């Protein structure tokens, strides 16, 4: 817990030298890995702020806190392993009350978007779906429920994971290298630190609203 507090303090104070400490940065990697794994892998955790964390990772690479290739490798593994977990949920547990309950709690618009993409584009939907929050967690579950073979799924899983992580992280890095952004570096880093927290709170509140509405309608 003390290390987490140190990381938050270093981010808030823009102390990149402290963040670059090997022990501290290893915890940063772990937190990012766990967040992406859970967001991609578990339907109840689909509100976690994966995209904004990748933007933050790109900004930290620009500050020499993290290194590009190891970051891409670690976060791609997190996203792809999480996506595999989502696929396994659909393949093995798709007809259980638990998974059906998770699916029922997600907003209907994401069900419709994921179903439309999967029906129209099949596995190619995984490539585009990675860039859509909630949808990237739903699609692998739907692929598992449909009985799609693990071998075919894994190819598109790892390819889409690599594309998503590389594109969004690179965008965060490129954004941090723009002269205007460099001149307002402190404000940008503060924004990138607050954004995942704000999205997390918004996701939690949105999920609670959906759950309460469904319980009220079923009462």
Swiss-Prot record:
The gene is yghB. It is found in: Cell inner membrane. It comes from Salmonella typhimurium (strain LT2 / SGSC1412 / ATCC 700720). Its main location: membrane. This is Inner membrane protein YghB. The lineage of its organism: Bacteria, Pseudomonadati, Pseudomonadota, Gammaproteobacteria, Enterobacterales. Keywords: Cell inner membrane, Cell membrane, Membrane, Transmembrane, Transmembrane helix. The chain crosses the membrane at residues 18-38, 68-88, 161-181, 192-212. One of its GO terms (cellular component) is plasma membrane. Residues 39-67, 182-191 are periplasmic.
